[in-house]
């Protein structure tokens, strides 16, 4: 990883910042979520995302490059063997930062950074199902419109006056029963 050139350093020097990020990444992979300051969480996110992308490729060269960044063999083995397969279907966005309340002693803003291991909400199959369902709805709507147009074109038949009077009588009886129930 190149030497950081811009912005404030975590801990003062570039070498100290690299060690801080290395230790934070190792703890994140080991525990799945850690609480740290907002500044450290924001710097840790791209660092961890690049490491996970290398772990997903899984080559020997990638493993050696990750071991340069995180010199803990157990954590790297866990990352390559167990965490990387969980992220196979995810193209990116392996971490989530949630802001928490400020720290009690120095009022520093605290965040929780965690690994997102849930499956993506929309996979390709689910997307295909949604597209097919929306096309079916459109076809049903078009069919309903066609039926409505046919009904409008059909000649109107005059209603029988006897059936109208019978319907009015039934409605009056129902209203009387409703009034009696109250």
UniProtKB/Swiss-Prot annotation:
InterPro entries: Ribosomal_bL17, Ribosomal_bL17_CS, Ribosomal_bL17_sf. HAMAP family: Ribosomal_bL17. The gene is rplQ. It comes from Corynebacterium jeikeium (strain K411). Keywords: Ribonucleoprotein, Ribosomal protein. One of its GO terms (molecular function) is structural constituent of ribosome. The keyword rRNA processing does not apply. The lineage of its organism: Bacteria, Bacillati, Actinomycetota, Actinomycetes, Mycobacteriales. Residues 150-161, 170-182 have a biased composition (Acidic residues). Pfam families: Ribosomal_L17 (PF01196). This is Large ribosomal subunit protein bL17. It comes from the Bacteria. GO terms for biological process: translation.
């Amino acid at each position: 990883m190149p030497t950081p050139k811009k912005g404030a350093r975590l801990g003062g020097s570039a070498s100290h910042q690299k060690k801080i990020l290395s230790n934070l990444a190792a703890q994140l992979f080991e525990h799945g979520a850690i609480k740290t300051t907002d500044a450290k969480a924001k710097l840790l996110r791209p660092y961890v995302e690049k490491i996970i992308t290398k772990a997903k490729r899984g080559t020997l060269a990638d493993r050696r490059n990750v071991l340069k960044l995180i010199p803990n063999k157990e954590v790297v083995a866990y990352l390559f063997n167990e965490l990387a397969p969980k992220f196979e279907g995810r193209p990116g966005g392996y971490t989530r930062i949630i802001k928490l309340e400020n720290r009690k002693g120095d009022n520093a803003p605290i965040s929780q950074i965690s690994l997102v291991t849930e499956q993506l909400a929309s996979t390709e199959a689910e997307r295909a199902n949604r597209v097919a369902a929306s096309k079916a709805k459109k076809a049903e709507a078009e069919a309903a419109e066609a039926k409505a147009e046919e009904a409008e074109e059909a000649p109107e038949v005059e209603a029988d006056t006897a059936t109208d009077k019978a319907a009015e009588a039934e409605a009056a009886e129902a209203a009387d029963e409703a009034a009696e129930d109250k």
